[in-house]
Amino acid sequence: MHTGARAGSRVAAAVALGVGALVLAACSRSSAGGGDAERSTTSAASAEASGELSLLSYNVAGLPQEISKEHPSVNIPKISPLLEPFDVVLTQEDFDWWKPGGLAETTDFVHYHERLRADVTHEFRTERHPGPEAVGIDIDADRPNMELGDGLGVLSRLPIGDVDRVPWTRCFGEFDSGASDCLAMKGFLHTTLELADGVSVDLYDLHGEAGGGPEDQALQADDFEQLAAYIADHSEGRAILLAGDTNLHTDLEHEDGGDGADVEIWRTFLEATGLTDSCTATDCDDEGRIDKVAFRSGGGVELEARSHEFQGGTFVDEQGEDLSDHQPLEVVIGWRAG
């Protein structure tokens, strides 16, 4: 396990040994909804810099206690200090927006997000979801039963840039149908991660459509086509770190895997974007898990996955039970620029 301090010291040492500091001029940043110009060109230092960071992706099962099969009101405060050692943490079901006057507003659920962040010292954090109108959703006309935000969050010891939150174009499932995906603004989050002075990569956090019915399978394919198109438009030529709960069962045996449909969706997405699954890169033995990390090099920044490990033994309660219905995935990423 790699602490932020250790990663930071390695980066500082590598940069200090570099020869010169000629940096490509970075474009000025724009608002969360745009930022295309700034994100389309990777800033790269002419002096060789290198380092390592620990990336954790974790679905924290933060649905309201009243509708959850887990125990978020008890477990989320226990999760918080366990996030501290990691350099970059990407969360799912970490909800920080709920419908004003909705069902969740009168419950203890509204405190989960702040409790999740209560015992960590990461300096750089995503701000609260701006609400449906800010991401192009007319809640009354399009999703009248929607109650929650996208549940996506970033905690980082490295600087992050402007944040763009993008909901999936469509969803399936209400209170009494499918996997209830239309109750939240599921989608993906895009920002930049500054590895060192003048060295940045694009960072994506996502939560995919759940369920294994025909409607779910069709939407899962649509979702990853939408994400691939966004990456082509916003991250052309750039290095990328992408992680999250894909809800793609790529083990060919799971009942929600669509008899291999999920395998094909993930394979097609990786081919379209040039990303590599960290499980494949490290020859891991659990490639069927739905929590995934993928990466690619670009813009003068080389990335590699040095380890891929689910932290099942750490994120548990006093009885050894998992604190979420997902185990967090840690991937150690090595990088080199110049």
Regions picked out by a protein language model, each given a short descriptive name:
Residues 47-50, 83-84, 118, 144-149, ...:
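Extracellular/periplasmic catalytic domains that process cell-envelope and extracellular macromolecules
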Residues 53-60, 79-105, 155, 191-193, ...:
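Active-site beta-strand/loop signature of hydrolases that rely on acidic residues for catalysis
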Residues 95-200, 208, 307:
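Structured beta-strand-rich core segments of catalytic domains in phosphoester-bond hydrolases
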Residues 14-16, 26-119, 130-139, 144-149, ...:
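N-terminal, active-site-proximal structural segment of metallo-dependent hydrolase catalytic domains
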Residues 63-68, 168-180, 207-218, 250:
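Surface-exposed cleft-lining segments at the edges of enzyme active sites
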Residues 56-63, 91-95, 125-134, 156-158, ...:
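Active-site-proximal beta-strand/loop segments in catalytic clefts of secreted hydrolases
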Residues 1-18:
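N-terminal export and membrane-targeting signals
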Residues 39, 231-241, 248-338:
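Metal-dependent phosphoester-hydrolase catalytic domains
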